[in-house]
């Protein structure tokens, strides 16, 4: 395909921070109407590379092309003026403003003072791409997925034809992820170029048309998603074959070490953040606590460590090795809990 059919491409781009080489001689591009997944392990240089397209960093070497024109992007405003918008993991929104007000705030010139015009144009964008967003709602009332949707609407409002999403599903439920993917497919159908930074292989295979892989800051290559599977992508990421199916034998004669019963924790505002949790942890096993960030994981661990007060009726018993009776942790200080053997 001719180079001018790329919406944006990088040629021999290098970026260093002191003695650390974040990206080395990287050349890649994304086509119009294509969803490109940028894949790599943590620290492989994915976000740094995209931050150069978005105007947050400036390359030490190499060129960035939008269409067939070499461009200089020294700020996010430069990027937006070229039709490039990046949606970061941490949203840049004012909580006490409505969706419409946040969109207006991101604009320059006098148009931002005409909130009705901003609202009407934003509503048309929402209808076109089937966004579920109340433009009059305050940001602090929104779910995480609604805030993310607002960030996407903001860059589309500014005329972005190239969208970069940095780990967009990290804070979403599976249902919210599927809604986001539906929106991304709508944008692709409209001719937008979309780059998704991720390390979730099953999502890469679900949403992308092509996968580009970085390893230790260098471009390894790309592969059409239809020709890829998790084993192939993993091998390209780490440079060798990886066994994805690990057999974990059951512990032999497991011994109870920690037992939680009816654990309820409320926030300072009186909101229940942990509701009647009960489970047992055994020696010789690793117990994973899964869930979207903000669903009580932090409060659970803090309650065990004595850093969170619990509601009446809760019990946390620690069965220390060689001890005849368990130690009740509820009501004990963090120091006493550490001395009991919980770290």
Describe the role of every protein-language-model region.
Residues 2-343:
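Glycine-rich phosphate-binding loops of nucleotide-dependent enzymes
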């Amino acid at each position: 395909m001719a180079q001018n059919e790329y919406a944006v491409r990088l040629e021999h781009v290098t970026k260093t921070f002191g003695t650390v080489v974040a990206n080395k001689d990287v050349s890649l591009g994304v086509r119009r109407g294509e969803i490109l997944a940028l894949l790599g392990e943590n620290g492989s240089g994915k976000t740094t590379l995209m931050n150069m397209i978005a105007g947050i960093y400036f390359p030490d070497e190499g060129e960035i092309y939008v269409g067939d024109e070499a461009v200089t992007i020294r700020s996010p405003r430069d990027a937006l003026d070229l039709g490039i918008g990046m949606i970061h993991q941490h949203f840049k929104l004012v909580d006490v403003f409505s969706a419409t007000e946040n969109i207006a705030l991101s604009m320059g010139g006098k148009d931002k003072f005409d909130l009705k015009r901003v609202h009407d144009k934003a509503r048309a964008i929402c209808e076109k791409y089937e966004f579920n967003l109340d433009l009059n709602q305050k940001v602090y009332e929104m779910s995480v997925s609604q805030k993310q949707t607002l960030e996407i609407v903001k860059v589309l409002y500014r005329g972005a034809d190239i969208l970069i999403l940095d780990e967009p599903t990290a804070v979403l439920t599976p249902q919210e992820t599927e809604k986001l993917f539906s929106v991304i497919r709508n944008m692709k159908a409209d001719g937008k170029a979309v780059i998704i930074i991720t390390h979730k292989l099953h999502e890469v295979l679900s949403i992308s048309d092509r996968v580009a892989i970085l390893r230790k800051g260098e471009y390894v290559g790309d592969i059409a998603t239809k020709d890829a599977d998790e084993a192939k992508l993993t091998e390209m990421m780490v440079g060798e074959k990886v066994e994805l199916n690990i057999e974990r034998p059951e512990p032999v004669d497991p011994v109870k070490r920690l037992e939680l019963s009816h654990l309820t924790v409320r926030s300072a505002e009186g909101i229940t953040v942990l509701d009647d949790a009960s489970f047992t942890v055994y020696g010789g096993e690793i117990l994973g606590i899964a869930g979207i960030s903000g669903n009580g994981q932090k409060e659970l661990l803090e309650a065990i460590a004595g850093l969170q007060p619990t509601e009446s009726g809760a019990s946390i018993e620690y069965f220390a090795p060689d001890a005849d009776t368990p130690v009740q942790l509820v009501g004990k200080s963090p120091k006493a809990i550490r001395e009991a053997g919980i770290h």
